[in-house]
Amino acid sequence: MHRVCFDIRLKNFGHGFWWVAYLDDVAVAFAGLHASVQWERTGYLARAGVHPAARVHGLQRRLIRVRIAKARRLGWQWLVTDTVENPTSSNNLIECGFRAFEPAKPWATKAAAYWRLKL
């Protein structure tokens, strides 16, 4: 699924929580969530993607909301994430309540936009 959505090598995301959305027994979207390595009681929205043929149906927003709900059940206070040159993902995050911020210690590329949500 990752290779279909992204033209980059997959990091080892063997920890945290993962969701996969299916349509007719075919995986069409995925998303991850794990604890932040920088902040306590904070989660990180890890890699997420939607198959090109399954886009424009709100799957990414649904997967963002599922991860927000899981973070709340875990008792986390914040969620953070980043996007790189991806206005669709940025807009979906904004629609789900995330706001842009500048972390003291950026963790992604120079082109990244950083997002956080107070839970």
Go through the PLM ranges and name each one.
Residues 116-119:
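Short beta-strand-to-coil "C-cap" segments at the C-terminal boundary of structured domains/repeats
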Residues 84-103, 107-110:
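Conserved active-site alpha-helix within GNAT-family acetyltransferase domains
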